[in-house]
């Protein structure tokens, strides 16, 4: 191991290590350590304060990490009445789900989020860590409650109603983002959801534009999409469903039809987004961006449950982009990841591995996918 690699190893183990400590461990002078650090900084291998290393393989996911509760009705839902259900609890949150999915696809994923100093927060972080996600930048806030998401699904697995308690994400301030920026900027790709406050989203987009950092945005919902600034230059790709896309385009969903797909996508692109993916559920996906326009038909799927399918779609596209695929090529990874997830009752499908993704896509390409 050469000197530069020795120094990088020590810095990765402890970003706050002093030059004197490194010199003592390696057995060279402090001035020699300083010289190596200067060279590494010039190369861009380390950057920012605390010797943050530049990891060209990491995806930094910023946003929600919740405790998810799902109640699935055993029969047709009756309003104003007691309905028999089965209840499950799991880790959730859009950013967290995307990070875990990427980890399952053999990508290096990191999560920047906030949780409360409660059992839910402790459990969410520990479970996320166990599943291969770097949660070292997650912040535990004293006196706060971890975000919760409660969904009611009908007997077919379709969402009927959901409740969200996300007040804790108001604490994800621009100041917090600045404090964590060296770690954010060191990633190869940044993915954020709109659980972040409007001012934090605006600063994130501006900084990614200024520093030419690739940024994906998941709008989460049409209401939360309103938090995005009008100027979206700095957003590399965005992934709205139809309702969210109409909101971003400033057009009421009720006034739109299939003939408006190109118009809606064009209006979003006019705000500065380079690649737009509009998910249409059973109608597939519309792509519009620097690579042209295309409609991707849906993959025939026996749907068990829809929760998490959108997060898997974003993760699949990120997987493709990280492996140098075009955005159109990456859309097939996204559709395949969603296809696999829809066939499970998990928000993050344990079956969704890199091998399964590649094999399923190969079968689909050959036209012999039997699922």
Predicted regions and their residues:
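Conserved phosphate-binding/catalytic region of the ribokinase-like
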Residues: 1-19, 25-54, 256-371
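Conserved N-terminal subdomain of the carbohydrate kinase-like
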Residues: 55-56, 78-85, 104-188, 358-371
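Glycine-rich phosphate/adenosyl-contacting loop at the front of the ribokinase-like
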Residues: 3, 7-12, 17-25, 29-112, ...
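Conserved phosphate/ATP/ADP-binding segment of small-molecule kinases
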Residues: 205, 209-293
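Structural motif
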Residues: 58-59, 69, 188-189, 237, ...
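Short gly/ser/thr-rich secondary-structure transition/capping motifs
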Residues: 42-45, 170-175, 217-223
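Glycine- and other small-residue-rich loops at beta-strand/loop junctions that grip anionic moieties
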Residues: 26, 113, 192-194, 217
């Amino acid at each position: 191991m050469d000197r530069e690699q020795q120094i990088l190893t020590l810095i990765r183990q402890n970003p706050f290590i002093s030059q004197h400590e490194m010199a003592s461990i390696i057995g060279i002078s402090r001035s020699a350590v300083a010289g190596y650090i200067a060279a590494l900084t010039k190369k861009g291998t380390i950057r920012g304060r605390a010797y943050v290393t530049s990891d060209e393989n990491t995806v930094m996911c910023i946003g929600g990490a919740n405790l998810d509760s799902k109640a699935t009705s055993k029969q047709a839902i009756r309003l104003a009445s007691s309905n028999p259900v089965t209840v499950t609890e799991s880790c959730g949150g859009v950013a967290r789900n995307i990070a875990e999915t990427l980890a399952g696809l053999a990508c290096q994923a990191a999560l920047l989020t906030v949780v409360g100093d409660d059992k839910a927060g402790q459990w969410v972080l520990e479970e996320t860590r166990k599943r291969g996600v770097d949660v070292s930048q997650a912040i535990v806030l004293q006196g706060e409650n971890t975000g919760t998401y409660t969904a009611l699904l009908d007997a077919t697995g379709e969402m009927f109603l959901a409740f969200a308690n996300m007040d804790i994400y108001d604490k994800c301030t621009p100041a917090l983002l600045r404090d964590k920026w060296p770690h954010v900027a060191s990633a190869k790709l940044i993915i954020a959801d709109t659980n972040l406050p409007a001012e934090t989203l605006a600063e994130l987009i501006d900084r990614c534009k200024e520093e030419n950092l690739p940024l994906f945005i998941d709008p989460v919902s049409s209401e939360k999409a309103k938090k995005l600034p009008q100027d979206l230059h700095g957003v590399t790709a965005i992934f709205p469903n139809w309702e969210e896309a109409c909101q971003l385009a400033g057009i009421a969903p009720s006034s739109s039809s299939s003939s408006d797909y190109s118009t809606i996508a064009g209006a979003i692109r006019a705000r500065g987004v380079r690649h737009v993916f509009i998910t249409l559920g059973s109608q597939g996906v519309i792509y519009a961006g620097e690579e042209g326009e295309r409609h991707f038909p849906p993959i025939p799927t026996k749907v068990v449950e829809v929760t998490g399918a959108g997060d898997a779609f974003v993760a699949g596209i990120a997987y493709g982009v990280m492996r140098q695929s075009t955005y159109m090529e990456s859309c097939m990874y996204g559709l395949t990841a969603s296809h696999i997830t829809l066939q499970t009752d998990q928000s993050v499908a344990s079956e969704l591995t890199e091998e399964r993704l590649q094999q399923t896509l190969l079968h689909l390409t050959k036209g012999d996918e039997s699922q």
